């Protein structure tokens, strides 16, 4: 019986979540639909520098130092850029808090059960950094530990919605990424992000 249960759980882990009706069907990124746009996208004049050239020109980010210390995809933020990044993190956390989110500071490593709880495992195991000695995983997003705060918990309807926000460093192997989409600050192995997460009743509209 235990083997049958284990076999069934292994199969269930391969079944994805059911998307909402408004999610378009598609095989790749070309099927994505723009839901909302804001502001005006400027037309850059001929000869404009790419962001990675600007970062190097003004000594804001040093990619070579990151390679020296760790490897590609781990940039070193310097001076004004380091302060700007810190200010952005505080700004987004403060704005989320004003909108009713409770700030939490989760661990940056999770156990296997947490990875399974949010679907990173087993599907994306090859994209995660794994500390074999302790069988722990560096988080790819704060969504993983924050969601698992509520794993195996029964939440009463009158407790909803539950809104959390969290800042964290994020770690992704990005195996298979290459070309123009990995230049500069694109497709990094380590980056910072503010995550918002809401637990809502199924009858509430998604936002």
Q: In which residue ranges do the predicted regions lie?
A:
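N-terminal alpha-helical targeting/anchoring segments
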Residues: 1-42, 60, 64
């Amino acid at each position: 019986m235990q083997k049958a249960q284990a076999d069934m759980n292994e199969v269930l882990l391969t079944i994805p979540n059911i998307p909402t009706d408004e999610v378009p069907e598609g095989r790749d990124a070309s099927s994505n639909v723009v839901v909302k746009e804001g502001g005006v996208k400027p037309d850059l004049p001929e000869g404009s520098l790419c962001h990675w050239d600007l970062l190097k020109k003004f000594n804001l980010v040093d990619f070579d130092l990151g390679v020296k210390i760790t490897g590609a995809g781990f940039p070193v933020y310097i001076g004004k850029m380091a302060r700007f990044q810190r200010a952005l993190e505080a700004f987004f956390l403060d704005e989320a808090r004003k909108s009713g989110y409770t700030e939490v500071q989760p661990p940056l490593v999770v156990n296997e059960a947490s990875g399974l709880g949010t679907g990173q495992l087993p599907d994306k195991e090859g994209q995660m950094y794994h500390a074999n000695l302790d069988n722990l995983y560096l988080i790819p997003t704060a969504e993983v530990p924050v969601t698992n705060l509520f794993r195996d918990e029964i939440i009463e309807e009158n407790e909803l919605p539950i809104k959390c926000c969290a800042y964290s460093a994020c770690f992704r192997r990005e195996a298979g990424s290459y070309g123009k989409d990995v230049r500069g600050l694109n497709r990094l192995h380590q980056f910072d992000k503010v995550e918002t997460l809401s637990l809502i009743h199924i009858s509430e509209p998604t936002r």
